[in-house]
Structure formats: C-alpha cells, structure tokens
C-alpha cells in the first residue's frame, strides 16, 4: 500500500485559460475493499481558483469519491481540487495521459499546488510554503 496523495491542483490556476486535462485510464477496479486508492474530487473547484491553504476553510464534506471500474476513463481538469486515498491493497493501477490546449505553456504541470506548498517537479523543490 501507499499513503495516498494530499489535496492538490495539477497546475497553477493563476490564469483560468491555461490548464491541463488528465485522462486517467483504469486497468483494474478501484474500490474501498480490494484496493483503496480512490480519487477524491471537489465538484466545481476548477472554477474557484487556488485551493485553500491549510489555515483557510475547506469543505471536504462536499467531496465526491470516484471508484472507477476496469476500462473506465476519468477526465480531470488541472485546476480541479483532488486527492487520492491510501492504497490498502498490494497496488493500484491507472494510466495518466495529459493534454493541453494549443498556446498553453509546455511546463503547465511543473508546479503542483498543495494546501501547504507549491512544489516544482523539475527541480524537486518547494517553491512556496503555504499556511
């Protein structure tokens, strides 16, 4: 198993016209009993801007739990607030293909926005602490 993934956005929502789209393809059933690792999403959050920091109100009770079946595809807007629950089985498999509209910066997903940090993947470094 793994510890899952904290609430985050895949790219900065600074400019709403620039974002990526994740296409998550599931090659196995993802469910609470067998695998864990369900994806949590906050409906409509792709329109709300920056995910709240740890000190700001966060209405987690409004989340939707996705438990895709084998062969399912999930489209996820890069500004959508989402997380992954801990994997409780041996493993969880999905394939993520990303795309973006023409004109979107190629490095749009280099900065991930978490509730406590902004993280730059290309340098493996925290670029901003959020409180």
Question: Model features per residue range: what roles?
Answer:
Residues 30-43, 76-78, 121-130:
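Short secondary-structure transition/capping segments
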Residues 67-82, 97:
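Conserved metal-binding segment of the jelly-roll/cupin
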Residues 21, 72, 93:
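Residue-level detector of short, conserved catalytic/binding motifs and their immediate flanks
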Residues 1-68, 104-113:
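Catalytic core of non-heme Fe(II) oxygenases with the double-stranded beta-helix
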Residues 80-131:
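Non-heme Fe(II)/2-oxoglutarate
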